[in-house]
Amino acid sequence: MVEANRASYLAAKAELKKTTLGTGTYDALHAMDYMVFGYLQQAQDKEAKILADEIAAIQKLNVENFVAAYSFAAIPSRLALEQRDWKKAAELKLSPSDLAWDKFPQAEAILVFSRSLGAAHTGTVQAARKDVERLHTLKDKMTTAKMGYWAGQTDFQIKAVEAWIALAEKRNDDAVRLMRAAAESEEASDKHPVTPGNVVPCRELLGEMLMALNQPAQALAEFERSLIRDPNRFWGIFGAARAAEASGNGRAARDYYAKLQTLTADRDTERPELAHAKAFLTMR
């Protein structure tokens, strides 16, 4: 995925250094989102940050469109969520600030969703609730504008955030019910060509929630199901490995940890999860 999008990115890289961007650059922005996604799955966090910093340096566009708005929202969101840096996610802000975000509620919703997940995971429930209110407002705008697909996406985003708010409030049954509903809704929808994948799959989040509730066998089933729809995801594979290990399924754990090592063979960052995988495989 990374190499397939590199040519498009390099072809327009010179334009990315300008303070105003023409329409030809949007192919590069689109490619950059795919590249950041791919880098983060392979634990090439430094490469991902280089691209994210290039995006962050852009302050003005002379032509605005959805592809650009989506990239501006998705790339910083991916960087935070794919590193499970919930504090960073909770601090996400729309940028460039003078982009007409009101024209692109479906793009703004990506960042608001990511920020609200960060808030819910860090226990700042009030901030998460405020963002849920914003998501409802954005969903209404999409519905009015006949953006049915994106309104549906925002609907399951709302459910997912409400699930993590419920978990923070120790309403565990409600949390699992809402998270499962979000996962089912997401999987009933198609992937839009603008994106390599949602910023975080709801089924993957369900697996992590079940792990937090000490239900590793159930979590393993959800991670494995998530990997069918969203294969080769760092957190999906690590989650499956960790769930298998915790549920006493050593063979499956070994297989998943080995897959994780293969996926990240060209990594530029030694994440703690990779150290755990190496330690597990060394002991077995």
Residue ranges and their predicted role:
Residues 2-10, 39-46, 52-57, 132-137, ...:
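TPR/TPR-like (Sel1-like) alpha-helical repeat modules
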Residues 34, 75, 110, 114, ...:
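"A position-specific structural signal for the A-helix of alpha-solenoid helical repeats
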